[in-house]
Amino acid sequence: LSTDCISEDTLKDSGAEHYCIKYARAYRQNINWLKTFPCNIIFIDGNHDNHEFWAKLPTESWNGGQVQRLPDAPNVIHLMRGEYYTIDGLTVWCMGGAESIDKATRTQGVSWWPEEIPSQKEMWHGMDTLEEHGYDVDVILTHTMPRMLMSAYFGNSFTLKENDPTGVYLDEVYRRTRFRKWFCGHMHEDIDKPLFRLQVLYDDLVSIDTKNPGFESTEQEARHGEEGKDP
């Protein structure tokens, strides 16, 4: 999801990208491209990020919460798990990470990291920051979604992902928190159900009008330029 890419404005990603990998040429190409953006690019981690890499980086305070910057592209900013920010006038709470259902086919430390699942400390920290703000926030950004909503969105398509402890944790966040919109990724589909105020993103970009008191969002095709796609 994104705002206008001007001055202090920001592009946001729900944890689908993992540039810190051991493929030097592709990594360098991506970094050189990201550095050209005249704005901050902020993201939450997913389940395929190199979590060991990010764990070694220093943190700093940014817009009310802790972040990490990519050393080779300082405009690329990692929003950390359980942190609470004010961005473009909106309050934002974040929780990256999720369980990989294909981890048995991956190699630990190369294509899979056990830290993909938020730790108990990170989960408690997330609840503490929400409690400090009265369980009230404009936007929630997570990689995966609450487990209790999966069947409403996908039927029986993602039963393996229902065992993810991250989704169980997010059930409690969903129950306790007053929020205006929740965005997540992980499912590799684009689907929005206004009844639940949660939108799953994959190819779509969402532009939030921060000046609109109704907090309306508009969808655009992100990569493929397809026309006439169902909402």
PLM features per residue range, with description:
Residues 1-3, 47-49, 82-83, 96-99, ...:
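Active-site metal-binding loops of divalent metal-dependent hydrolases
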Residues 224-231:
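Long, low-complexity, intrinsically disordered segments
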